[in-house]
């Protein structure tokens, strides 16, 4: 189910009056509800969230960290997930039936996740099985719908995050000769390349044309990349890197592996949001960095490291628009709905989908 389907089915819309409240009033009310509920309320926040939201997060992290935290939390009655829809789905699947997972704004989706739906995936699988036989194991980035995770779990595969993709790909190659990697071609390509797989041994599946694009024929294909991408990270270009180095040859460039292979290759380093944060934390004072990832995180890193010269690799970059739908008014409204006993934006993955999706998620967690 795409995020558009979710919106059509949902009446969980915040009243406009919340937008008229002062920031101080909203912060006071959020803090009061957090104090009232104590450990019965848990707020995980993704690194890409706004500061006005992240200040109230009980735990911040990337997709892998938040998935692991959600799985371990047994105390909270309500988990208010400050992230996007697929993350809240994952939290729902990893927590108990007695726990309620809430997304403050149901419009907080992920364009990448919507680039692979079940009809497209079933058609692709049928055609790829015809071409390659039973030699393929599917993997999906956690930035995917619960239905896609279920498909992958049903066919023996696992989910991956940008933190653990390399480990999961290594495991997958012990299971089958070939990998189908959904839905982000860039993370799949960059990870496979790091494992020593040549670009000519990778092919791209175009779901819009229902065709496989392989430069050197089908025989040597080891990785089949779904033609999807992150709309934020695709905006970092090789021109950004050339311009940055021309302006300052001493600057170090670190990017997220959702960037294109060309950008990753030209950069000094690449890794998950956690890896980027850890790298900057450990860097010496006075070091200079250009970071290729979402702007909210970059701005937060800049603020936290006044002793270093840090900037965005793309000076015209904007934050992730869907992630930014979770703002302070929506967080407050969501918490007050819980306080009234009428939680809105409840995320509930159907049992049949959940069972197969959990196979994929648990395989990932056991590998990493």
Swiss-Prot record:
Superkingdom, taxonomy of origin: Bacteria
PANTHER family, alphabetized: QUINOLINATE SYNTHASE, CHLOROPLASTIC (PTHR30573:SF0), QUINOLINATE SYNTHETASE A (PTHR30573)
Cited Gene3D superfamilies: NadA-like (3.40.50.10800)
Residues that hold [4Fe-4S] cluster according to the record: 110, 230, 320
Binding site for iminosuccinate: 46, 63, 141-143, 162, 256-258, 273
Pathway: Cofactor biosynthesis; NAD(+) biosynthesis; quinolinate from iminoaspartate: step 1/1
Note accompanying the cofactor annotation: Binds 1 [4Fe-4S] cluster per subunit.
Keyword Nucleus listed: no
InterPro entries reported in the protein's UniProt record: NadA, NadA_sf, Quinolinate_synth_A_type3
UniProt xrefs under Pfam families: NadA
This enzyme's EC code(s): 2.5.1.72
Protein's name in the database: Quinolinate synthase
One cellular component term from this protein's GO annotations in UniProt: cytosol
């Amino acid at each position: 189910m795409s995020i558009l389907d979710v919106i059509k089915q949902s009446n969980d819309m915040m009243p406009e009056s919340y937008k008229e409240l002062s920031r101080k009033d909203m912060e006071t009310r959020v803090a009061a509800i957090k104090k009232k509920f104590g450990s019965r309320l848990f707020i995980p926040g993704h690194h890409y969230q706004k500061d006005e939201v992240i200040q109230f997060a009980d735990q911040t992290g990337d997709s892998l960290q938040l998935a692991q935290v959600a799985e371990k939390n047994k105390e909270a009655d309500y988990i208010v997930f400050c992230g996007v829809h697929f993350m809240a789905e994952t939290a729902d699947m990893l927590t108990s039936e007695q726990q309620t997972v809430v997304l403050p704004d149901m419009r907080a989706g992920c364009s990448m996740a919507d680039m692979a739906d079940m009809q497209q995936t079933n058609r692709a699988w049928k055609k790829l099985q015809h071409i390659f036989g039973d030699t393929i194991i599917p993997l999906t980035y956690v930035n995917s719908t619960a239905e896609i995770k279920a498909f992958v779990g049903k066919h023996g595969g696992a989910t991956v995050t940008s933190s653990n993709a390399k480990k999961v790909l290594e495991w997958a190659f012990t299971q089958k000769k070939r990998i189908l990697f959904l839905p982000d071609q860039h993370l799949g390509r960059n990870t496979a390349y790091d494992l020593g797989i040549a670009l000519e041994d990778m092919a791209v599946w175009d779901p819009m044309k229902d065709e496989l694009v392989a430069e050197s024929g089908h025989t040597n294909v080891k990785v089949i990349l779904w033609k999807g991408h992150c709309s934020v990270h695709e905006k970092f270009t090789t021109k950004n890197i050339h311009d940055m180095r021309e302006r300052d040859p001493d600057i170090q460039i670190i990017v997220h592996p959702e960037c294109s292979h060309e950008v990753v290759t030209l950069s000094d380093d690449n890794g998950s949001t956690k890896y980027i944060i850890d790298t900057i934390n450990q860097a010496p004072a006075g070091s200079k960095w250009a970071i290729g990832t979402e702007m909210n995180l970059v701005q937060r890193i800049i603020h936290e490291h006044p002793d270093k010269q840090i900037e965005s690799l793309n000076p015209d970059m904007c934050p992730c628009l869907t992630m930014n739908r979770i703002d302070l008014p929506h967080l407050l409204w969501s918490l007050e709905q819980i306080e009234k006993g009428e939680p809105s934006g409840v995320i509930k993955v159907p049992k049949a989908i959940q069972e197969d999706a959990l196979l994929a998620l648990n395989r990932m967690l056991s590998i990493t």
